[in-house]
Amino acid sequence: MGIRPAPASRQRLEAFSIAAPNACMKAANAFDPITSPGGTSEEDWNGWPGLTRLPRVDAETLVPAGTRAVVVAPHPDDEVLMVGGLLAQLARKGFLVRVFAVTDGTASHRGSSAWTPRLLRQVRPRESRAALRCLGITEPPLRLKLQDGALSKQHGRLAERLCSLIGPHDIVFTTWRRDGNPDHEATARACASATRRRRARLVEVPVWAWNWAQPGDPRLPWRNACSLPLDADAKRRKFFAIQAYESQLLPDECTGAQPVLDALMLQRAARPFEVLFPAQ
């Protein structure tokens, strides 16, 4: 079945692919990747030769025959921001794929009377299911239902849960352990613990780091990094999967907050590749 964007999605298509504005705020020492506007522009990242020189890897190398891809997403939408293109390629090739949603993303609109935690608990998992269908994955995410915004206090509990869910033939993808978001980092630590104990392989993926890091930033493990090229179908499916997260794409009329997935985040999601940090 062909994937058709909703009218609002068509209006966002141009914004999804425009070049980043020259006036974007540069990352600084005090930059908060979550609450501060702007970040390192996509123009700056595109101008860095190191990004295009990363070793290339294909889906079959990342997830060899006889293994299963497991994506551990701290919040609904992280699975697509991390590896939406990879998931589309794996689904098309018939690979085994499983997504674990650590939280229901109920803390994305703090202080909002429009997007309350109760409403988000209903909406965001539904958005995630729709997004996975766009990628060709029919099995819904397994919801672990931990508390959004408090995973740093729950990473031991999360690690234990993951140990019961993964095995030695799994390739586990999750957010980078120094991504700048406490939930992302706690999830990565839990995944690192669980994969060591279960002898599974771990691949970490930066999400918020693109905001605060600079091209060539020595704080990122570039020596371990690789790049997964995305074909046209994977890019298209990833775009429509992002559009499923309407709660994250709209400004909050109650608080005046801008969309969680702002223009810079969307531009990064439109890249023809995904950058990954396989654990060494």
Where are these regions (language model features)?
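Short hydrophobic transmembrane-like helices used for membrane targeting/insertion
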Residues: 1-3, 18
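Basic polycationic patches enriched in arginine
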Residues: 4, 10-12
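A short acidic, often aromatic-flanked loop/helix-cap motif at beta-alpha or helix-coil junctions
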Residues: 148-152, 210-213, 234-236
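Short, flexible loop segments at boundaries between secondary-structure elements
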Residues: 199-219
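A conserved mid-domain beta-alpha-beta active-site/ligand-binding segment of alpha/beta enzyme cores
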Residues: 214-250
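Acidic two-metal-ion nuclease catalytic site recognized across multiple nuclease folds
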Residues: 278-280
